[in-house]
Design a protein with these regions (language model features):
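Class I SAM-dependent methyltransferase SAM-binding "motif I" and its flanking Rossmann-like core
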Residues: 31-32, 38-100
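Short acidic-glycine loop/turn motifs at beta-strand connectors
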Residues: 130-136, 140
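Flexible gly/pro-rich beta->alpha loop and the following alpha-helix that scaffold active-site loops
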Residues: 1-50
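General beta-strand structural signal in soluble alpha/beta enzymes
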Residues: 21, 53-55, 121-123
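Conserved anion/nucleotide-ligand pocket segment
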Residues: 85-132
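Residue-level detector of flexible, active-site-proximal loop/helix-junction positions
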Residues: 2-4, 59, 101, 127
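Short, active-site-adjacent cap segments at secondary-structure transitions
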Residues: 27, 59-62, 128-130
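A general structural signal for short secondary-structure boundary/capping elements
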Residues: 65-67, 138-141
Length: 141
């Protein structure tokens, strides 16, 4: 559970050059970001030019909504999350872990289910998506 106060989150994010949000359960992560108020602070800092680095769940959290990731994650791990709206830092839906022995089938299920309705960006565990202003590029292995 989140123990950081909104003020301490703001203080830490202000003094650092970048914001790194790691992996784990995407639904639990977003639940805790919202509970602490960190979601709003992160968006504010990024909109003012701070670098955001998201890994796995941290990258999915940057999307407009995280509901699509239920195919590879467990929404029930976040019983208090009633709003699956993501941080909205990007206008696409990131699908990580393509080809991963455990997470790959979930990534493939997302592609199959959502490729015609969502703007998906699919990467494996050795790639990254770089967003600079309006330019989006895939960084190779």
């Amino acid at each position: 559970a989140s123990t950081a106060s909104c003020e301490s989150v703001e203080e830490k994010l202000t003094k650092n050059d970048m914001i790194f949000v790691g992996g784990g359960n995407t639904f639990f992560l977003l639940q805790e970001l919202k509970k602490s108020g960190a979601d709003k602070i992160i968006v504010q800092k990024v909109n003012r030019g701070k670098l955001y680095i998201g890994e796995s769940a941290g990258a999915i959290a940057a999307c407009p909504d995280i509901g699509f990731s239920a195919e590879m994650d467990e929404p029930e791990k976040a019983p208090e999350l009633t709003d699956r709206t993501g941080l909205g830092l990007v206008d696409f839906y990131l699908v990580p872990h393509l080809g991963h022995p455990e997470m790959g089938p979930g990534a493939e299920a997302i592609i199959e289910k959502y490729s015609s309705e969502l703007k998906l960006k699919v990467i494996d565990d050795y790639q990254a998506i770089l967003v600079e202003d309006d330019k989006v590029s895939r960084l190779p292995k």
